A protein has these predicted regions:
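Residues on the lipid-exposed face of transmembrane beta-strands in outer-membrane beta-barrel proteins
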Residues: 38-42, 57, 96-102, 146-152
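Transmembrane beta-barrel architecture of outer membranes
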Residues: 7, 33-37, 50-52, 93-97, ...
Length: 200
């Protein structure tokens, strides 16, 4: 997985070797996109306990140009068609996870429990159509997850395989736009009638 902006996804792939490792990566893409990933594994030699921390961060300003949209001219008095940059379409995501468990035991070929937290902040530039421009609207979400997985070959009977998993997630999402403003593609705005009435 992984994309180059436009609210890209975090790419996390864990290794399967039973040894310590640490992988750190950082990348830069178009539209002010930045990605950073950390994947590690630590094995306790005596018990064989495996701990795998993972962190992924993705940020993009997404300030690419729109094509042939209506916008105000420099005076602000007339409308023209131009190619302005998106000015409120940033994206930030964070995923932090820790997994712990065992492999190649008499009672399990693999058993892991994990806990993770993810966060996404997305600026909203337009509504369902591109001539509806926003300048302060945002969508924020948080998610917690706990899970467990168990794998055993030759379970009870020879060649019988058991794969079991449990997972529970708590999600919270909020979309906010408290600014009573009408925005234009040049980044300017006028105060909406509703806000004017509030101040009266």
């Amino acid at each position: 997985m992984g994309t180059d902006a436009l609210g890209g996804t975090i790419n996390i792939i864990t290794k399967q070797e039973k040894k310590d490792y640490l992988d750190v990566s950082y990348g830069i893409g178009s539209f002010h996109t930045h990605k950073a990933d950390l994947n590690a594994q630590f094995v306790e030699k005596k018990t064989g306990l495996i701990v795998r921390p993972t962190v992924g961060i993705n940020y993009s300003k997404n300030d690419y140009r729109m094509k042939n949209v209506q916008m105000r001219d420099e005076s602000g008095d007339n409308f023209i068609y131009g190619n302005p940059k998106r000015f409120h379409d940033g994206y930030f995501s964070l995923l932090a996870q820790v997994e712990a468990g065992f492999v190649n035991k008499s009672w399990a070929d693999a058993f892991f429990v994990s806990a993770s937290y993810s966060k996404t902040d997305k600026e909203l530039q337009t509504g369902s159509v591109q001539n509806k421009v926003y300048g302060m609207a945002e969508r924020n979400s948080d998610s917690w997850n706990i899970s467990a997985r168990y794998q055993k070959y030759n379970f009870i009977l020879k060649n019988m395989q058991l794969n079991a998993s449990l997972s529970h997630t708590w999600d919270h999402s909020l979309t906010v736009d408290t600014a009573y403003r009408k925005y234009y593609w040049d980044g300017g705005y006028i105060v909406s009638q509703r806000l004017s009435l509030i101040h009266i």
